[in-house]
Amino acid sequence: MKNLAIFDLDNTLINTDSDHAWPQYLIKKGLVDAAETEAQNEKFYRDYQNGCLDIDAFLKFHLAPLARYSKEELAEFHREFMAEYIIPHISPMQRMLVQSHQMAGDETLVISSTNEFIITPVCHLFGITNIIGTQLETGSDGRYTGNYIGTPSLKEGKITRLNQWLAERGETLQSYGKTYFYSDSKNDLPLLRLVSEPVAVNPDAELEKEAKEKGWPVLNFK
């Protein structure tokens, strides 16, 4: 029976938060108002860390710049972003973790609250093609509208989106032998409690506390 290995992305497979880093890249490029974007970015990041993020307000802020450029321009920006802000924050151990599951024949999947535009090329670095992120709306002109569609994959939303993905494949979690989920954040406790093999990676204080209480493995890649 095949196993399913699910990974969070930010601060789990990469030692940074791509959602937080993207506005920093836009500021550096001079593509957004620096002071306003920095203030908003830091506020939303604190809220996320504290488990009280207003996902609608955050996505309105975070997705607006995507609507200003063509997908070709955004792809070029993303290549620069990856080289400067993402690749330097991936350790050999994180790559080896994914490879160990791939070599064992496990199905691998990333579920992230970060949007698909940002996470898809990052997941491809790990050879992961099953990717669930917050979905973006595309207009009739082929550009992103700045809106999202469906359920954002945050907190319980990760379970909703996982179940949708499984249903599309004619599966449930019970279709797999072991189900792993690797995450750093207390925001992911709903899904961590659902799988058979929860693993805390670079955990925040609340997740580390629960992991120790329940005997979950704890990995540190930072």
From Swiss-Prot:
Keyword NAD included in the entry's annotation: no
Catalytic residues (UniProt): 8, 10
EC number: 3.1.3.15
Superkingdom of the organism of origin: Bacteria
GO BP field: L-histidine biosynthetic process
Alphabetic keyword roster: Amino-acid biosynthesis, Histidine biosynthesis, Hydrolase, Magnesium, Metal-binding
Transmembrane segments: none
Enzyme class (EC, first level): hydrolase
GO molecular function terms listed in the Swiss-Prot or TrEMBL record: hydrolase activity; metal ion binding
Substrates-to-products reaction catalysed: L-histidinol phosphate + H2O = L-histidinol + phosphate
Residues reported in the UniProt entry to bind Mg(2+): 8, 10, 184
Protein's pathway: Amino-acid biosynthesis; L-histidine biosynthesis; L-histidine from 5-phospho-alpha-D-ribose 1-diphosphate: step 8/9
Cofactor remark from the record: Binds 1 Mg(2+) ion per subunit.
Gene disruption: observed consequences: Deletion mutant is histidine auxotroph. Complementation of the mutant with hisB from E.coli restored growth on M9 without added histidine.
Cofactor(s) needed by this chain: Mg(2+)
Pfam families: HAD
Similarity comment: family membership: Belongs to the HAD-like hydrolase superfamily. SerB family.
Function of the molecule: Catalyzes the dephosphorylation of histidinol-phosphate to histidinol, the direct precursor of histidine.
Protein name: Histidinol-phosphatase
Source organism of this protein record: Neisseria meningitidis serogroup C (strain 8013)
